[in-house]
Amino acid sequence: MLKLFILKLFLFLFLFSSNCFAEWKKITDSENVEIFLNFKEIKKNNDLIFFWQLNNYVKPLREKIFSIKIYIKVDCKKNKFNPLIFSYHVEPMGSGEADIKNNEQTKWILVKSKSKHKLILKTACIASFRT
């Protein structure tokens, strides 16, 4: 229970301080979204990597959401991922008021070839081996 509290506290503090220190690099975009990664914050733990992704929307999503930060766990060898935390923001680039949600589903998602997820995860996995 204490570990869970400490983890949530750490993530809360990180989410609200991350914009000041984050170095978001644009990976891809489409009609309504730009997708960024924070390469400086990629963490490795055995065969898994953990990183933050930022989706910045040109037109707001539901409830005036202009950006979403997602903390993602990836198994680079097995080509699968699990989004752990979603942070919904009312301003662009992960700024402004945030609504933080833990992902209740713990199922891994297999990456489809030729998808944006494939590009994002491949980029993060390659970057993790350089650090």
Language-model regions, residue ranges each:
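Bacterial N-terminal signal peptides
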Residues: 8-17
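Bacterial N-terminal signal peptides that target proteins for export
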Residues: 1-7
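N-terminal secretory-pathway/extracellular module detecting exported/lumenal segments
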Residues: 20-70, 75-131
